[in-house]
Structure formats: structure tokens, C-alpha cells
């Protein structure tokens, strides 16, 4: 029996590794464009991108570089590719005409829905509708008019049969030749024919399968959607080890092992990877996080700025050196590394979790404690595994993204993950780890997501800095015996319910909250004028926070 998909560490929580930007407004749209480009199967000559005029992309268009991400994805770039920032220039060089349209959207009700309508140089056509669901994760809604949901965790072989000519014997023969089949679906649509989709753990050989795929019949064609995620789903995936801290703690007590060891086992069950691979992968991510927090201070790099994106890290460094700083100790160091995390330097890869760069804010809080307490890299690594477990529970029970649960889902979840990680790092008990996470999340429950276009990263930066800088405080409260009352899963459920009750204008559409204030309206007007007069390649990366 196939196990239903569930969140895992390297796909959902700490991923995708990407260029600076929003995970849901930059990495996600890029990935959907990448799928659309593969569906087309040849270089594009015409790229039409349709966006919901009432959706989130319409509200923030430009300030998060959704446009460059979508176009770059169609050109074949993944979220970690620095060429994304030159997507329009490269599309023009390739002879591809690009247009965007804001319209009524009927194919999806998700606030982060997008439709790609592509024409290729050889005359092929392709349409893909998809949703950016948060944290860089995506889902397809339709491909070439056929309903199909896939999240990029397998290879997907698509067989289109416009005239319904492929018989059962041919289907059976094809399926016998497919390697490591994870799942399949078949759907018919009047006027379009039949689509058969095969989810595979390894890439099929289209050349070898060509006879079976097309069967020499008119109106039959095939395409492959390549995986987007580092961990590819397997047929023998084990069930989810835990979906609450209560269950997680029970396993740790029964097995007499620390929480981080149970977290490693969770990922082994989810991914099928051996223990050594998982630890090495987390260590690699920790290295990327370390560079993101420190590159602006330690490397000879240019920090891209604009009238709407100042060099916050440079300002903080000058202030700290002046002797006038009020914050000191762990808090001052957390601020320093957090500003480094948000520098938005092309080529300095970032690790989301759950928002763009979120893992690096978590790392900033952890690293400040590591410095102050003289802890080892292994101590920090153990904390990251605990943070990943908290993130997996959050993704299981909620949708930690601004478009669904407001800034609670992003800054609030990051704060909970960081508080839990710090408590683990300094030797807290499993109960104290849970209390720290729940206390932190409760403090940030109910926050809207209302990024101000042209508002120098406000109020987003205030919130993530608050969550980051309070993480060690909530760890201390838990260590001192302050009980959270709500177990973590209940705190997540409460935050989810409140977040989903917020009106659309408070869910990353830049239509309400702080965005409705007169000063914010003036910022928007200034930004829109600058955006209209500037070229895409002249704009800094879309690192809002």
C-alpha cells in the first residue's frame, strides 16, 4: 500500500536552496515555470503568463521578483540559478516574447495561482496552471487542460491521447516497461481526450519507450515533468513517524534517545536515505546558512540596494561599532547575523524555512547562542534537526505561509523552530523544548501578512527580527519552568484557525493592514513609478526580509 505524502525536512522545511527572494513568490513561481517549460518540450517563442487580478501575485507584483522567477523557470532555470535575475534579458536574446496579464482566474482559487500559456519555436503549445503553496512548494492544477495534481516529488511521464486510440493492451505493455512506478492516474476530458500520468522514482527513457508511447497513432504524444525536489518519493516510503510533539517525545522516551535522534529517524523513514546522507545533507545546509548570515561582513561582495532596499547590515555594523547600541550579548549578535541573512546578495544562496531565507534567521538565533555558550558545530547540528522536526509538524497541521496563515505562519513558525532548537542545543529536556516552541508561537499568533510595496521591507523585517531575537528569551523561559499550557500541536492548530480567518487583504495581497495607511500608499506610488521606469536587471533581488 502506498503511504500518503507527508512533510519531510529537505523538501518541505529547509528548502529549496535558492537565490535571494521569497520562497512562495520567487522559488515557487520559478518551479512552476520550470514545469511549464518541460511540458512544452522545446525553446519558447511566446510566453504568456496569466495572474489572478485578486490574488497575492497581483498585490506584490515586482517587489518579490515574481516576474523574473516565472520567466526564468520557463527558460529552464531552477531557484538556485543566478541567471534568474537576468531572465528578461535572456528571454529577449533567445527570441522569446513575454507578456503578463492580470485577469479573473477560474482554474484555481489559491491566492498564489498562475497560468502559463506557451508556444514553442517548432510550433508546439503547452498550458500549465499551478499554485505556489508556500515554502517553495508547488502543485500543478491542470496540464494542457487536464486536471492533474503533482508536487514535483517524482518524475511524471505524461501520455496524451487526443483521440482515445490507445487500447488496454498497449497501456499494459507500457506500464510493464516503466521503471519504479510510484503511482498513476488517468483522466478524460471532453474535447481533449485522455491523459495518463505515471509517477516514477527514476527517469524513464523516452527514446526506448517511444514505440509504446506513441504507438504510431495520430494525436498521441508524451512529455516528462522532471522532479523539483531533492528527495524523490519512493513506493516503499514508511509511515510518518510523528505529527505532534507529544508523539515525538513518547518515542524519545521509549527508545531512550534524544529528540534529535528521533528526528533523524523521521527523515530516514520519509526519504529512504541512509543516516549518513541525512546528517551530511543537514551539515551542508548549515554551511549555506552560515555563509548567508556572514557573507556581507566577511566577503568582498556588493550588497545590491535601491531606494526601497537599503543596506541594513551595513547600517547595523556602523551602529554597533559606534558604542551607542542598546542591545548587547546574544541579542546584539542575533541582530547582526539576522541582518546578514537578509542582505539579498546574488550568488549567496539562501535556505528557506518556512519563508525565503527563514532557515538562515533560525540559524542566526542559534549561532548567537552557540558563540555565547562556546557550543560545538555538532551541538548546532542537533538543534537544526529539532528545528526541522518542529517545521515538519507545522507543515503537517497547517500551511505556514503568509498567503494562508499570515505572518504567524512565517515569522511565527521560524521563531518557534529557533526557540526549540536553542533549548535543545543548551541541554533542555524534551518537555522544555516543546514549551519553548509553543511559547514562541503563541506570542506571534494572529499577525497578518501585509508587505508594503516600496516600504523598505516593512513590516516584514520588524516581525522576523522580533521572532529571531526573542527565540533565546523563550528558550530561557522554558528552561526556567514557564509552561506553555498549550502543547505545540494545539498552539499550531490555534494559529492556523486564526490565520485562516483573516480576510484576503491581510494575506500577502498588499491590500490591507499596514498597506492601507497613507504613508504606505505614498510608498506604493513611489515604488510603482520607479518599477515602471527601471529595467528588471537593474532591480535588486526580491529579498523583502
Task: Briefly describe each language-model feature range.
Residues 48-97, 385-423, 431, 436, ...:
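A structural-propensity feature for long, helix-poor, extended segments
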Residues 86-100, 424-545:
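Functionally critical mobile loop/hinge segments
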Residues 134-136, 159-183:
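Short amphipathic alpha-helix segments
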Amino acid at each position: 500500500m502506498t503511504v500518503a505524502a507527508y512533510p519531510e525536512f529537505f523538501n518541505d522545511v529547509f528548502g529549496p536552496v535558492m537565490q535571494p527572494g521569497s520562497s512562495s513568490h520567487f522559488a515557487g513561481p520559478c518551479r512552476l515555470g520550470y514545469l511549464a517549460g518541460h511540458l512544452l518540450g522545446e525553446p519558447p517563442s511566446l510566453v504568456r503568463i496569466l495572474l489572478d487580478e485578486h490574488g497575492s501575485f497581483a498585490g506584490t507584483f515586482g517587489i518579490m521578483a515574481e516576474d523574473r522567477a516565472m520567466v526564468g523557470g520557463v527558460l529552464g532555470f531552477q531557484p538556485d540559478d543566478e541567471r534568474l535575475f537576468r531572465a528578461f534579458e535572456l528571454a529577449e536574446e533567445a527570441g522569446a516574447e513575454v507578456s503578463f496579464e492580470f485577469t479573473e482566474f477560474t482554474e484555481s482559487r489559491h491566492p498564489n495561482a498562475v497560468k502559463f500559456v506557451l508556444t514553442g519555436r517548432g510550433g508546439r503549445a503547452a498550458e500549465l496552471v499551478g499554485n505556489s503553496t508556500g515554502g517553495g512548494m508547488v502543485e500543478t492544477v491542470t496540464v494542457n487542460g487536464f486536471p492533474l495534481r503533482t508536487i514535483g516529488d517524482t518524475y511524471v511521464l505524461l501520455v496524451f491521447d487526443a483521440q482515445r486510440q490507445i487500447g488496454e493492451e498497449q497501456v499494459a505493455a507500457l506500464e510493464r516497461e516503466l521503471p519504479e512506478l510510484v503511482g498513476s492516474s488517468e483522466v478524460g476530458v471532453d474535447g481533449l481526450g485522455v491523459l495518463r500520468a505515471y509517477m516514477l522514482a527514476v527517469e524513464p527513457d523516452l527514446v526506448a519507450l517511444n514505440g509504446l508511447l506513441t504507438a504510431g497513432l495520430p494525436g498521441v504524444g508524451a512529455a516528462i515533468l522532471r522532479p523539483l525536489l531533492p528527495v524523490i518519493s519512493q513506493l516503499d516510503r514508511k509511515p510518518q513517524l510523528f505529527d505532534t510533539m507529544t508523539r515525538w517525545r513518547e518515542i524519545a522516551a521509549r527508545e531512550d534517545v534524544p529528540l534529535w535522534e528521533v528526528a533523524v529517524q523521521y527523515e530516514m523513514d520519509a526519504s529512504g536515505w541512509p543516516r549518513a546522507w541525512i546528517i551530511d545533507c543537514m551539515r551542508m545546509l548549515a554551511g549555506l546558512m552560515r555563509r548567508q548570515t556572514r557573507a556581507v561582513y566577511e566577503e568582498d561582495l556588493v550588497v545590491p540596494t535601491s531606494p526601497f532596499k537599503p543596506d541594513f547590515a551595513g547600517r547595523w555594523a556602523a551602529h554597533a561599532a559606534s558604542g551607542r547600541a542598546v542591545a548587547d550579548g546574544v541579542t546584539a549578535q542575533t541582530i547582526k547575523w539576522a541582518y546578514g541573512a537578509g542582505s539579498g546578495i546574488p550568488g549567496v544562496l539562501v535556505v528557506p524555512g518556512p519563508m525565503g531565507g527563514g532557515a538562515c534567521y533560525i540559524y542566526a538565533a542559534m549561532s548567537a547562542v552557540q558563540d555565547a555558550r562556546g557550543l560545538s558545530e555538532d551541538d548546532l547540528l542537533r538543534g537544526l534537526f529539532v528545528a526541522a522536526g518542529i517545521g515538519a509538524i507545522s507543515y503537517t497541521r497547517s500551511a505556514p505561509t503568509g498567503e494562508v496563515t499570515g505572518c504567524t505562519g512565517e515569522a511565527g513558525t521560524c521563531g518557534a523552530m529557533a526557540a526549540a532548537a536553542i533549548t535543545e542545543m543548551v541541554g533542555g529536556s524534551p518537555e522544555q523544548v516543546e514549551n519553548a516552541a509553543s511559547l514562541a508561537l503563541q506570542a506571534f499568533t494572529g499577525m497578518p501578512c501585509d508587505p508594503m510595496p516600496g516600504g523598505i521591507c516593512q513590516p516584514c523585517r520588524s516581525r522576523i527580527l522580533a521572532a529571531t531575537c526573542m527565540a533565546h528569551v523563550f528558550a530561557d523561559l522554558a528552561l526556567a519552568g514557564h509552561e506553555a499550557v498549550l502543547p505545540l500541536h494545539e498552539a499550531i492548530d490555534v494559529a492556523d484557525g486564526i490565520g485562516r480567518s483573516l480576510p484576503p487583504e491581510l494575506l500577502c495581497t498588499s491590500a490591507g493592514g499596514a498597506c492601507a495607511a497613507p504613508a504606505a500608499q505614498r510608498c506604493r506610488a513611489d515604488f510603482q513609478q520607479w518599477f515602471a521606469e527601471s529595467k528588471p536587471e537593474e532591480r535588486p533581488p526580491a529579498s523583502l526580509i
